[in-house]
Amino acid sequence: MSCPYAGNGNDHDDSAVPLTTEVGKIYGEYLMLDKLLDAQCMLSEEDKRPVHDEHLFIITHQAYELWFKQIIFEFDSIRDMLDAEVIDETKTLEIVKRLNRVVLILKLLVDQVPILETMTPLDFMDFRKYLAPASGFQSLQFRLIENKLGVLTEQRVRYNQKYSDVFSDEEARNSIRNSEKDPSLLELVQRWLERTPGLEESGFNFWAKFQESVDRFLEAQVQSAMEEPVEKAKNYRLMDIEKRREVYRSIFDPAVHDALVRRGDRRFSHRALQGAIMITFYRDEPRFSQPHQLLTLLMDIDSLITKWRYNHVIMVQRMIGSQQLGTGGSSGYQYLRSTLSDRYKVFLDLFNLSTFLIPREAIPPLDETIRKKLINKSV
């Protein structure tokens, strides 16, 4: 059956006149389907003991790797656009579009796991012996995605060796080394946030105004707590306010913030965190609308990678349990479970921004000077 969108529905029309004399490639040639569809080599079949589900296992992982390649392609283009002193609104829109594409791809990858789970543990055991020493830990493209996103080497969980040592060929190791040296998406987003208009001390000086608003907000909370007639309830409220004051101190005191960065509990520089908070507060302003979408999509990417890791962990536990080693010699389930921690969450600071919110009515109002600046300035 021919494609209904390609013509009048006939398989062949002898009277049709070609629209061009250029020689093109037919569908299969263009997509190189001869290579793509001939790349499923079932080792169980070569061993004269074919296992039906090995084919599903191969297809699923090859599909993952194809989508990983597209994610890397999108990340590289986004990093190129972000690597500039000024990013105009047109580029910001394109970055948002491509990040959204990555989000949709990751949603597809998350939804792909249940297809693999149609295979039972016994079915998997029938061909698992053929997989060693292969392991998902050896997915070069996934490691490149992590590095290009901004997962730091010191934040990684070690299991037997450095993660890059599992790759034996020099080309793969060079790719890993280059991805570690090149500016990551995290670094480029940080630079971009540091340039957020309105942070200048000689201008709107958002950070000073925000501190004043927080002080007034907490003081109002104290006054309200002091009017509490029940002593125990009053003390509890005052204690809670002091805890909140300490939380705010962690962003207002640069030394405390830097200590949290060194400890791995924060990722952004102090200035970049200020920019992220400002964009969050004023996201309804036209100039900050796209930047806010960009930050939201970065969180979506982090969340979906975590969901994919979690689904992978649960699937591995169902297939091999929690005590066996992985086929590549890793600690299997235990190692995978350890990657679900916040140390693998690249844009952790964006998730924690809600900790520092204040009521809408307490947000410092924008003056006319900064409004005009936002109209005329790209971020």
UniProtKB/Swiss-Prot annotation:
Record: residues binding heme: H312
GO biological process assignments: compound eye pigmentation; kynurenine metabolic process; L-tryptophan catabolic process; L-tryptophan catabolic process to acetyl-CoA; L-tryptophan catabolic process to kynurenine; ommochrome biosynthetic process; protein homotetramerization
Top EC category: oxidoreductase
EC number: 1.13.11.11
Cofactors: heme
UniProt xrefs under InterPro entries: Trp/Indoleamine_2_3_dOase-like, Trp_2_3_dOase
Details of cofactor binding: Binds 1 heme group per subunit.
Pathway stated in the Swiss-Prot or TrEMBL entry: Amino-acid degradation; L-tryptophan degradation via kynurenine pathway; L-kynurenine from L-tryptophan: step 1/2; Pigment biosynthesis; ommochrome biosynthesis
Residues the entry annotates as binding substrate: F57, I58, I59, T60, H61, R128, T327
Resulting phenotype, Y236F: Strongly reduced enzyme activity
GO molecular function, one term: heme binding
Catalyses which reaction(s): L-tryptophan + O2 = N-formyl-L-kynurenine
Keywords attached to this entry: Dioxygenase, Heme, Iron, Metal-binding, Oxidoreductase, Tryptophan catabolism
Outcome of swapping Y335F: Strongly reduced enzyme activity
Subunit structure: Homotetramer. Dimer of dimers.
Role: Heme-dependent dioxygenase that catalyzes the oxidative cleavage of the L-tryptophan (L-Trp) pyrrole ring and converts L-tryptophan to N-formyl-L-kynurenine. Catalyzes the oxidative cleavage of the indole moiety. Required during larval growth to control the level of potentially harmful free tryptophan in the hemolymph. In the adult the same reaction is the first step in the ommochrome biosynthetic pathway.
Name used for this protein in its record: Tryptophan 2,3-dioxygenase
Source organism: Drosophila melanogaster
